[in-house]
């Protein structure tokens, strides 16, 4: 099954007007793999700036979160309609930092995923285990438990990208090996196939966690690793190398 390679850049709570402009200008000036779909996710205040400045047809923008209801009295939240209004095509949901710092449950993430999809935003759905869960041999149990509430609510997965991001690898420099990522991605796809059928073969499963310009090429021949969700390196020139890692 041929799946379009996908590279997301999650800027998290980083950036300024000047630095976001510089990142977008670097992407505009670079030769990017035309077969790779690229999505950048700057902080909310800079989404419109990024969208209006981008000149590459293969690059779009994403919100870092969205709410599971429409506009209203929800201080501090952002709606799907607002993200679409500034040109966002995607939203990142379920990131481990949202799960831990903001105490978001898998059930609520499933609600937000369904609402986003029903209202026209594509979703990058993040799953992944902690170091203690990994050491206890519970990786697959954890990711399945994170997927199950979404599986219960979503019938059409064509606009979902799953990002497997082991919590122990995020921002630590301890990336999973390409072989380990392939094995886990294969298991995730097999579980999906059991639950949602043949469409699982079309769902892109990307890896996140200390991906950089040096290690991204090691994943090149892994059939179930369909791209990357990149954190810190997406703010640096090496992001272009990651985008072009399959060339």
UniProtKB/Swiss-Prot annotation:
It is an enzyme of class 5 (isomerase). It catalyses: D-glyceraldehyde 3-phosphate = dihydroxyacetone phosphate. The keyword Lipid metabolism does not apply. Disulfide bonds: none annotated. Pathway: Carbohydrate biosynthesis; gluconeogenesis; Carbohydrate degradation; glycolysis; D-glyceraldehyde 3-phosphate from glycerone phosphate: step 1/1. The active site is at 95 (electrophile), 165 (proton acceptor). Substrate binds at residues 10, 12. GO terms for molecular function: triose-phosphate isomerase activity. Homodimer. This is Triosephosphate isomerase. It comes from Yarrowia lipolytica (strain CLIB 122 / E 150).
């Amino acid at each position: 099954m041929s799946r379009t390679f996908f590279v997301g850049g999650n800027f998290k709570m980083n950036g300024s007007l000047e630095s976001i402009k510089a990142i977008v200008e670097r992407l505009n000036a670079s030769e990017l793999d035309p077969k790779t779909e690229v999505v950048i996710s700057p902080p909310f205040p800079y989404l419109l700036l990024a969208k209006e400045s981008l000149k590459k047809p293969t690059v779009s923008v994403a919100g870092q979160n969205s709410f599971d209801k429409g506009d209203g009295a929800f201080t501090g939240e952002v709606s799907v309609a607002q993200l679409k209004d500034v040109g966002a095509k995607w939203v990142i949901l379920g990131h481990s930092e949202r799960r831990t710092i903001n105490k978001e449950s898998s059930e609520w993430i499933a609600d937000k995923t369904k609402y986003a999809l029903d209202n026209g935003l594509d979703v990058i759905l993040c799953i992944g285990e902690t170091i203690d869960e990994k050491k206890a041999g519970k990786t697959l149990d954890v990711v399945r438990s994170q997927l199950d509430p979404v599986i219960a609510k979503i019938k059409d997965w064509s606009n979902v990208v799953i990002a497997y991001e082991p919590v122990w690898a995020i921002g630590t420099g301890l990336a999973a090996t390409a072989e380990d990522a392939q094995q886990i991605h294969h298991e995730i796809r097999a579980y999906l196939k059991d639950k949602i059928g043949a469409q699982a073969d079309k769902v892109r499963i990307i890896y996140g966690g200390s991906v950089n310009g040096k290690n991204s090429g090691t994943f090149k021949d892994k059939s179930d690793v369909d791209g990357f969700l990149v954190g810190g390196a997406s703010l640096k020139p090496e992001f272009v190398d990651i985008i072009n890692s399959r060339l």
